[in-house]
Amino acid sequence: MSTLLKSAALVLCAGVSCVQATETAKHWDFNIGAMYEIENVEGQGDDKDGLYEPSVWFNATWDAWTLSLAMYQEGPVDYSSMTRGTYFDRPEFELRYRFIGTDDFTFGLTGGFRNYGYHFKDEHGAKDGSANMQRYKIQPDWDLKLTDDWRFSGWFAMYQFANDLEKTGYSDSRVETETGFTWILNETISAKINYYLERGFNMDGSRNNGEFSTQEIRAYLPISLGSTTLTPYTRLGLDRQSNWDWQDDPEREGHDFNRLGLLYAYDFSNGLSMTLEYAYEWENHDEGENDRFHYAGVGVNYAF
């Protein structure tokens, strides 16, 4: 889960009309929010009662500059005993500059830094060491008006990981992108179809840790009903391979993941907004048993 991507989307959506309406009056726009997410695989004890994922964020925008700060945490939790397994803390900083910002074309560039502070635990719940890994990011984004009804938009991120990779199992490099077309049917309904790619690889030829590849078609159908926006969506897997079990089995394993979800968003028209989201995913694996996956999230955001 990328906390800053979700929060940045809210800022950009709220900021486009504001920038156009007050192009000559520069001022600060702030945005603060929090989210709680859970993820769970049916019938497995490895993740206990599921993954516990709280996050908070803060964004500040001045003219073409946007500064973003976030703190995210992830790890399995057992709510009956209130105990946790291995988890990590993930503070993050990003700075975006908008080079072009018109209704016809928007182009921006983001640089970012993220730290992963891992806290390992053994099978008995006792502390079992730690790791401290960093991720550096550069990401262009764009939004192009093709016609009154069609737009082409997306982003492309390049990541470099450093330190303690042998402990965390990560590859040293990664690319991630989501890009596609939006068709605006009317003021209420639009349709978006995107291509998504995420790939982890190693620039160091002596390593094969944590390499993977994911390709998906992602489709969204936002329905705007006044202050309420409902967005049913799906993710259709095209190709998915991984070797996350790199310590015992470096061979790549194939997967087939497909997801259906619904995002509910409500704008209170006073700067406050909230989201509710649920998704169900079918996860089929070449090796081992297939899984059924549930995701749920609730978020609140205040813009001022």
Where are the model-predicted features located?
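Cleavable N-terminal export/targeting peptides
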Residues: 1-33, 66, 103-105, 303-304
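Short glycine/proline- and aromatic-enriched beta-strand/turn motifs that initiate or cap beta-hairpins
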Residues: 21-81, 295
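Transmembrane beta-barrel strands of outer-membrane/channel proteins
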Residues: 32-38, 60, 69-73, 109-115, ...
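Outer-membrane beta-barrel architecture
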Residues: 55-59, 94-96, 139-141, 178-182, ...
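Repeated loop/turn-to-beta-strand initiation elements of outer-membrane beta-barrel proteins
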Residues: 63-69, 102-109, 146-154, 186-193, ...
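Detector for outer-membrane/organellar transmembrane beta-barrel domains
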Residues: 142-244
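Outer-membrane beta-barrel "beta-signal"
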Residues: 223, 266, 278-280, 290-304
